[in-house]
């Protein structure tokens, strides 16, 4: 999986990759509807982030979407998802959800076919994807080899897609007749799934939340550089777009027909969510934080966080 080619404008994958990134910028890190966010995040895995995926599907065709997600997460597991991800609280919380996530639509169909069959038997049977993942993780915890890692990734992709299907069918993840329980369960499963999806996407993008591209007063030797001076020495690169002015300050806008804008790129684990929120306050309402492809001086590409104009761009959906 050569993720570096995703962001090269001369690549056939560029349009698909930037379309996925636009979804990520609009939804995945927003405070909007969590079910919609989950759909958009899964869209990025199934149809946006290209990888070397023989199961890729078009935007108007649902066939193969589950296989696409399973395949991409399997590849990500092999190449990018470390033991820290699998030992982390987000993955383990999803793994140990009780009761397990089951295929609501298949349970509904089986109950109609066999109305006298005990519901708990049907639910257990249709929890097979989640239960298989648990068994494979037990083996993975013992062996930690490549084969187990790929298998865990594939099954994790299937589980995430199952959550998506449950949401889409409207039944979601209900496990009882009580509406309050249903709402609590829906939100809990979606929250856990979305946390895992975000981490997978961040890994596939090269953890852009720990990179910051700057072009204005935060640059070295400029008046506000002290706010990020502890992040270390920057790399140098460029982004494609245009610069407008908001008062005395430049505002970047991502645009496919724009110019190469020079930027400094800082990479540091100090760019925590708390640190970025403080930078959000400093930048103010004229700017919004987003991900963008950056071209380095050696011709390679990486995705970085940048503060851009708080308006729709040519890449916006």
Name every feature range the model reports, one short phrase each.
Residues 32-43, 89, 151-162, 185-196, ...:
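Short, well-structured alpha-helical interface segments that form or flank functional binding sites
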Residues 105-157, 164, 273-276, 280, ...:
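A charged, amphipathic interaction segment
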Residues 43, 49-50, 172-174, 219-220, ...:
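Short, solvent-exposed loop/turn segments at secondary-structure junctions
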Residues 170, 174-183, 224-227:
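Short conserved catalytic/interaction loops centered on acidic-Pro-aromatic/His motifs
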Residues 129-140, 154-165, 181-208:
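Amphipathic, Lys/Arg-enriched alpha-helical patches that create a basic surface
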Residues 206-317:
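Glycine-aromatic micro-motifs
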Residues 2-144:
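Helix-loop junctions and short alpha-helical segments
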């Amino acid at each position: 999986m050569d993720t570096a080619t995703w962001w090269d404008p001369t690549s056939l994958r560029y349009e698909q990759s930037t379309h996925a990134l636009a979804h990520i910028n609009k939804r995945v890190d927003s405070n909007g509807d969590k079910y919609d966010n989950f759909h958009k995040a899964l869209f990025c895995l199934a149809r946006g982030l290209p990888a070397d995926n023989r199961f890729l599907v078009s935007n108007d065709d649902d066939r193969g979407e589950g296989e696409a997600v399973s395949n991409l997460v399997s590849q990500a597991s092999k190449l990018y998802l470390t033991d820290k991800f699998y030992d982390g609280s987000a993955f383990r919380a999803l793994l140990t959800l009780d009761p397990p996530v089951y295929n609501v639509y298949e349970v509904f169909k089986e109950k109609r076919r066999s109305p006298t069959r005990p519901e708990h038997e049907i639910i257990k049977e249709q929890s097979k994807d989640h239960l298989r993942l648990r068994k494979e993780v037990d083996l993975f915890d013992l062996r930690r080899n490549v084969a187990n890692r790929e298998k865990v990734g594939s099954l994790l992709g299937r589980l995430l897609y199952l959550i998506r299907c449950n949401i889409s069918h409207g039944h979601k993840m209900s496990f009882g007749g009580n509406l309050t329980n249903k709402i609590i369960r829906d939100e809990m499963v979606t929250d856990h799934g979305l946390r895992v999806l975000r981490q997978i996407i961040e890994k596939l993008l090269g953890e852009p939340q720990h990179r910051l591209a700057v072009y204005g007063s935060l640059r070295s030797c400029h008046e506000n550089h002290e706010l990020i001076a502890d992040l270390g020495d920057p790399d140098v690169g460029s982004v494609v777009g245009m610069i407008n002015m908001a008062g005395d300050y430049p505002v970047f806008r991502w645009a496919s027909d724009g110019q190469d804008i020079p930027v400094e790129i800082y990479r540091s684990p100090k760019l925590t969510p708390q640190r970025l929120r403080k930078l959000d306050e400093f930048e103010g309402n004229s700017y919004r934080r987003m991900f963008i492809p950056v071209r380095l001086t050696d011709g390679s590409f990486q995705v970085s966080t940048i503060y851009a104009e708080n308006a729709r761009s040519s890449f916006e959906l």
